[in-house]
From Swiss-Prot:
CDD domains: lectin_legume_LecRK_Arcelin_ConA. InterPro entries: ConA-like_dom_sf (IPR013320), L-lectin (IPR016363), Lectin_LegA_CS (IPR000985), Lectin_legB_Mn/Ca_BS (IPR019825), Legume_lectin_dom (IPR001220), Leguminous_Lectin (IPR050258). One of its GO terms (molecular function) is carbohydrate binding. Keywords: Calcium, Glycoprotein, Lectin, Manganese, Metal-binding, Signal. Belongs to the leguminous lectin family. The lineage of its organism: Eukaryota, Viridiplantae, Streptophyta, Embryophyta, Tracheophyta. The keyword Glycoprotein applies. It comes from Styphnolobium japonicum (Japanese pagoda tree). Glycans are attached at residues 60, 76, 127, 201. Pfam families: Lectin_legB (PF00139). This is Bark lectin. Ca(2+) binds at residues 143, 145, 147, 150. Mn(2+) binds at residues 141, 143, 150, 155. It comes from the Eukaryota.
Length: 270
């Protein structure tokens, strides 16, 4: 694993606060992940977000995994907002494809955020389907089950303080196949873009929406994944993340001409 967090202070250019990490696979007792609920790292090196017993997924399971280091997503002193990119691979597999539930999501949330609600279609992120600015959550959901607040198909959605997605695209979920995802956020345009590709058949899905992170999130957040299974015994699936990388870049302030060195921030992780 490669993990870095540093400040670059260069002559006549903006300084940048950068957080970057990469998990090509996961290991047991992964110290740099905060596991919540049913999440664990399997013996195969996969981040298993929901419970599997004797090879069978369990209903009413909720699990989350967050990176332990906070992400400085915007700076109150300058008003600047970070850009970020994250890529990951995951597999969702249901014993019965027509009864998949409920899905997996990547999210940004306050540092002290814990599992909310009853799981199921609320993803452990929300207490109800109603909007509330108090959540301070932005998420990208990969939804395998249609709930009352959803479009009438499996979909990828961008969620802002509500499980009711602000924008969606139909998702042709492939049962048991590896999906590769890239999510980017460009601070200059406030554009959040999601792309998902299945290498097995080269199908791709793209979704974009304007999201003002500064008006939604606190200055410091954690990033991670959450997943749930259904609230009845027949609606189940596995929700496994195979790999994950993330980089955020926050421009901080202009440097003086006399400073042309590169300085490390207060801590670094190797």
């Amino acid at each position: 694993i490669s993990i870095t967090f540093f400040l670059l202070l260069l002559n006549k250019v903006n300084s940048a606060e950068i957080l970057s990490f990469s998990f090509p696979k996961f290991v047991s007792n992964q110290e740099d992940l905060l596991l919540q609920g049913d999440a664990l790292v399997s013996s195969e090196g996969e981040l298993q977000l929901t419970t599997v017993e004797n090879g069978v997924p369990v209903w009413n399971s909720t699990g989350r995994a967050l990176y332990y280091a906070p992400v400085h997503i915007w700076d109150n002193s300058t008003g600047r907002v970070a850009s970020f990119a994250t890529s990951f691979s995951f597999v969702v597999k249901a014993p019965v494809a027509s009864k998949s539930a409920d899905g997996i999501a990547f999210f940004l949330a306050p540092l002290n955020n814990q599992i909310h609600g009853a799981g199921g279609g609320l993803y452990g992120l929300f207490n109800s389907s109603s909007y509330s600015s108090s959540y301070q959550i932005v998420a990208v959901e990969f939804d395998t089950h249609t709930n009352a607040w959803d479009p009438n198909t499996r979909h990828i959605g961008i969620d802002v303080n509500s499980v009711k997605s602000t924008k969606t695209v139909t998702w042709g979920w492939e049962n048991g196949e590896v999906a590769n995802v890239l999510i980017t956020y460009q601070a200059a345009t406030e554009m959040l873009t999601v792309s998902l590709t299945y290498p097995s058949n080269q199908t791709s899905y793209i979704l974009s929406a304007a999201v003002d992170l500064k008006s939604i999130l606190p200055e410091w957040v954690r990033v991670g994944f959450t997943a749930t299974t259904g609230l009845t015994t027949q609606y189940v699936e596995t929700n496994d993340v195979l790999s994950w990388s993330f980089t955020s870049t926050l421009e901080t302030s202009d440097c003086g001409a006399e400073d042309n060195n590169v300085h490390l921030a207060s801590y670094a992780f190797i």
